[in-house]
Curated annotation (Swiss-Prot):
The gene is rpmD. InterPro entries: Ribo_uL30_ferredoxin-like_sf (IPR036919), Ribosomal_uL30_bac-type (IPR005996), Ribosomal_uL30_ferredoxin-like (IPR016082). GO terms for molecular function: structural constituent of ribosome. This is Large ribosomal subunit protein uL30. The lineage of its organism: Bacteria, Bacillati, Bacillota, Bacilli, Lactobacillales. It comes from Lactobacillus helveticus (strain DPC 4571). GO terms for cellular component: large ribosomal subunit. Part of the 50S ribosomal subunit. Gene3D superfamilies: Ribosomal protein L30, ferredoxin-like fold domain (3.30.1390.20). CDD domains: Ribosomal_L30.
Amino acid sequence: MTDLKITLIRSAAHSLPEQRKTVKALGLGRVNSTVVLPDNAATRGALLKIAHLISVEEINK
């Protein structure tokens, strides 16, 4: 099972409201904040919406 380490690298301040809500729903707040989430379809779908704002690394358990 793998997890995803997601880091916000660009601010969501001037993004669309839906993208700002997605950033907040993933648990990201400020630039350079990082969360570790499970690798599943729901997470991947959310990441596709804000791919231009984040960096993603896979973490093997």
